[in-house]
Amino acid sequence: AGITGLSVACELMEQYADASVLVIERGLLPTGASTKNAGFACIGSLSENLHDISLMGENGLVKLVQDRYEGLHILRNRLGDHNIGYEACGGYEIVLKGEDNGFIDKLDDMNALLYPLFNKNIFSLCNEKIAEFGFSASHANKLIHNSEEGQIDTGKMMNSLWMYAQKLGVKIITGAEVTSLDESEQGIIIATQEMNFFAQKVFICTNAFTKSLFPNIELKPGRGQVLVTKPIQHLKVKGTFFFDEGYYYFKNFEDRIIFGGGRNLDFDNESTLHFGSNQKILTQLNTYLKELILPETTFEIDYSWSGIMAFGTNKLPLVEQIS
């Protein structure tokens, strides 16, 4: 019953109003990354997009950005910006001192490549905002703005999506973990620890947890660490921000900072399906808060959490018919 599962259920009911659609959720609330993501409505930073071109070519990158952009608009149109807390605040990529910034020379090329999607140039240098946001000038070298990014309120969005699905007639059962799927001549038997369900068609929208049902699928889990500061008076940071090829990400939420990432510091331990903290990564997040993001501001950490994502052989959605 995360973003993918509920969105699929809503799409089915929108197209087939008389259908009987049931969503089965293993947790009391959606368990994976949907309720634990930090609320970034992003389509890809300049350095990330250039890296993706090396993996999938220019046409592949354009299709990926288009899918992200259109997917966000489907969510916004379906639920309404107010109901998901959407803010078109823009996205920013911080280029750190000492970091190879040769990719900035390709900014115009990237704008030209993506221009047909947006009918405008979406990337621009805005180094003057480094001081405006209060970042450390000894650590932040350059700042790149992406006009088409924003942020959402994750809790508000999931609550709205849940209510919208139920309004359409989607049934949702929580606290029922699916243990197996077995095909029969009459349809598919969905086994849980408590009882079995029967369906003609099943959509598997379990993301990182799909391997428990299909061990051979090419998906790897990736845990993300996130921390939240206590409210900060006169907070200068406004918007969504990324650095180190998107491995670190932060944004303001009201008068707090939500900061996550650092998975690249410990890939092995973060490739797990178990929720929990990683002290090595949390220490680095604290260091970046002190030295880069809030160098002249006293702050305290309020709490932290982890969420589990899934990664395939590339960044494209894994959508296929199993049987």
Predicted regions and their residues:
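C-terminal catalytic lobe of FAD-dependent flavoproteins
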Residues: K142, E148, I293-S323
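Glycine-rich active-site loop/strand segments that organize a redox cofactor
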Residues: G32, K36-Q66
